[in-house]
């Protein structure tokens, strides 16, 4: 009979910024995960704060990256933005999930990074920041469903 191991707690490698003493100073979290793939296409993480996600996706499309920022739902789960969401900090996870065969292998090396993909994501996030800062939800502690 197969057994499933259920850990008593989850391990997350962090510097502690989601801890209560630091969380009060964090306005929002934008997690950029696996952004360097040449075939960049970002679906919408289902756990992310919708208002943050909407701003970034709208900005990306306005910059002409309609094939990058797509409306396909992505069920990531267990990613690095979870502790921030649990601390009540609005968070968005931009993660490349489709068709990257080198993920978590010894072949996942810097030569696989696309400067163009990094530029697209960096440009989009940078252009999104003023809208995020001006949004009524910025700095509040609503649920991730907004």
Where are the predicted features?
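Sec-exported extracytoplasmic/periplasmic mature domains
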Residues: 15-19, 57-61, 65, 86-89, ...
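His/Asp/Glu-rich mid-to-C-terminal helical/loop segments that flank catalytic regions of hydrolases
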Residues: 101-146
